[in-house]
């Protein structure tokens, strides 16, 4: 195998299976150091509430806030600042996201496991959820739709958003418009670690929630993981955003380069992985990346991200999909002639985009699938956000006298053998009263 390091990441030519671990490696995150940084901020917010939140908003977001909550007149004002084209785009995306997530409703049914024993499940919404919406270099108003829409469908009573304000104390108007469309109940001008702490612990102004959703930088992710240890559930662990593209000699190099760059512009720690069966296609894609980079407003971010990226030449698409399954990407684009066949072989991925025309951007915004997905290899064990993310399944069982007769002796025997006599007796007294 030839391995070459360039400004556009690493090139792997016909890697052996022993090299797949190198290909799958992500940039190292010092989670211990991050935990040390965030825990003091979280402890301060837990102890001092709004006062601490305002202090950190001043320190980190460089804004002095008299009121942390976004008021109704600010939301109405924001609607007037959104042009019709963006408003219609938001409504289109909302419709598709709603349609897809509405189709995921749980259908309960009763199961008689044996005579007289009736079991079933009931899906119940999480009553209070908190959604973190990043601001920073690119305010993610699309994430509002992705997180709030399924929460509303699920029936969550309190849907709380925290998002950082600008230096004038204003929230991005598109974020406010998306929140109104999706049915968010409360919005707060809080960013970063302090937002996670406010939602996890509750303050005088911000209600405590039961589960926190949403992306963020490494400090936000560390804060989410810290509060999840004792105080609140979170959607999933997460790292920098990533994409894997599988291409062959039928792929369109312009499309593939655009897909890779759309991921690279997310942030300097984003990662792109290209796996192709064609050396000529690889060369054409690299040339297209160079060309398209020149007109990108976020060129410097994309160039830095490409330094973390990998370009892999393999013998066939079966090998390509095997490397993908080892990598377990957040996004997988299969832009090959045999995309249907390969789609059946996908084991590990957050979301999959099939064919020449399914760009990642479609799922990021408006196809209807959710863009909040597991990263950093967590797709091996986690799925992306869906309707079930906002629900709990409660199990029920009913035993008649016949049911006691059906399973009673098995229950007593098992309890006695685990030396839990009170467990055995709870069933034994029922058996003796049939």
Where do the PLM segments sit?
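N-terminal Rossmann-like NAD(P)+-binding subdomain of aldehyde/semialdehyde dehydrogenases
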Residues: 1-127
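Conserved NAD(P)+-binding/catalytic subdomain of aldehyde/semialdehyde dehydrogenases
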Residues: 183-271
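Short acidic-hydrophobic, aromatic-tinged amphipathic segments that line or gate anion-handling sites
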Residues: 3-15, 186-191, 311-316
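A glycine- and small/hydrophobic-rich beta-loop-beta segment
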Residues: 266, 274-349
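Flexible, glycine/charged-enriched surface loops at secondary-structure junctions
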Residues: 106-111, 233, 270-275, 295-305, ...
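Conserved small-residue-rich beta-alpha loop and adjacent elements
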Residues: 111-177
């Amino acid at each position: 195998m030839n391995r070459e390091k360039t400004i556009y990441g690493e090139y792997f030519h016909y890697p052996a299976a022993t090299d797949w671990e190198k290909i799958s490696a992500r940039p190292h995150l010092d989670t211990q150091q991050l935990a040390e940084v965030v825990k003091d901020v979280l402890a301060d917010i837990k102890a001092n509430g709004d006062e601490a939140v305002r202090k950190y908003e001043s320190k980190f977001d460089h804004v002095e806030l008299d009121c942390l909550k976004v008021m109704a007149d600010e939301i109405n004002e924001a609607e007037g600042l959104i042009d019709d084209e963006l408003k219609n785009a938001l409504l289109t995306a909302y419709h598709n996201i709603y349609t897809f997530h509405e189709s995921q409703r749980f259908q309960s049914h009763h199961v008689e496991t044996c005579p007289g024993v009736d079991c079933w499940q009931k899906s119940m919404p999480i009553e209070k959820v908190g959604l973190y919406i990043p601001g920073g270099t690119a305010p993610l108003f699309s994430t509002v739709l992705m997180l709030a829409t399924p929460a509303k469908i699920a029936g969550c009573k309190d849907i709380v958003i925290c998002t950082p304000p600008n230096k004038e104390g204003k929230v991005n108007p598109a974020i406010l418009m998306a929140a109104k469309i999706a049915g968010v109940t409360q919005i707060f001008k809080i960013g970063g670690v302090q937002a996670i702490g406010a939602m996890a612990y509750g303050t005088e102004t911000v209600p405590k929630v039961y589960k926190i959703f949403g992306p963020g930088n490494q400090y936000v992710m560390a804060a989410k993981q810290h509060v999840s240890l004792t105080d609140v559930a979170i959607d999933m662990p997460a790292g920098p955003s990533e994409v894997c593209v599988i291409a062959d000699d039928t792929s369109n190099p312009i499309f593939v380069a655009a897909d890779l760059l759309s991921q690279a512009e997310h942030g300097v720690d984003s990662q792109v992985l290209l796996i192709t069966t064609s050396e000529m296609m690889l060369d054409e894609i690299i040339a297209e990346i160079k060309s398209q980079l020149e007109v990108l407003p976020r060129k410097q971010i994309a160039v830095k991200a490409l330094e973390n990226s990998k370009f892999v030449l393999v013998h066939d698409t079966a090998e390509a999909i095997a490397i993908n399954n080892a990598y377990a990407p957040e996004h997988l684009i299969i832009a090959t002639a045999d995309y249907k066949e390969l789609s059946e072989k996908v084991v590990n991925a957050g979301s999959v985009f099939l064919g020449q025309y399914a760009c990642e951007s479609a799922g990021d915004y408006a196809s209807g699938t959710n863009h909040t997905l597991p990263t950093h290899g967590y797709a091996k064990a986690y799925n992306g956000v869906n309707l079930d993310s906002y629900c709990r399944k409660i199990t029920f069982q009913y035993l008649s006298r016949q049911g006691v007769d059906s399973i009673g002796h098995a229950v007593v025997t098992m309890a006695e053998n685990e030396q839990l006599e009170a467990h055995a007796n709870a069933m034994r007294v029922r058996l003796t009263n049939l």
